[in-house]
Amino acid sequence: MELNEIRKKLKKELDKGRYEHTKGVMYTAGCLAMAHEYSMEKAMLAGLLHDCAKCIPNDQKIEMCEKNHILINPVEYKSPYLLHAKLGAFLAETVYEVSDPQILHAIKVHTTGEPDMSLLDKIIYIADYIEPGRDKAENLPYIRKIAFEDLDVCMAEILHDTRAYLSSRGGSIDATTKMTYDFYRQYRKKHD
């Protein structure tokens, strides 16, 4: 399926705000790809599809994951909105005909991250955080700047802020997010 065809389909599937965010992530991912010498086309496609399952009601997310043998951990059962990443990778492959394993993986890990992420994984994770429609994060101007300089330091900053935000609100922190934070925190300390 071509990028424009996917955009038209997503415009019908997502609510207006989510569609605008998706376009922002797509273009931001393309810019980051250019800055870090990665395929702009692959980054834009992954950015466009990263939230393709976001507007599915949470009970349906659980049902679809169970039906399609997508593993759900206890934190995801408690916070099923997290499932949109795993389910999104599944839908990108089965509905939007994406076969590139790098794109599918970037969609799958864009919410929790994982230790030692690929270049595309980091581009999508970061683009989701810094796209122009985002304005709530405390360190956003700094994070946007370093996104174009050092993706690993940027990951460390985003994960630090995300962890602090979730802790301050009493939210559950997914085990994978904890491992991702530990990986990038250690990486940053070694390279400061």
Regions found by a protein language model. Name each.
Residues 164-192:
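Charged phosphate-binding loop/patch that engages nucleotide di/tri-phosphates or the phosphate backbone
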Residues 7-12, 35-157:
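Divalent metal-dependent catalytic cores for phosphoryl transfer on phosphate-bearing substrates
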Residues 16-18:
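A short, charge-rich alpha-helical start-of-domain segment used by transcription regulators
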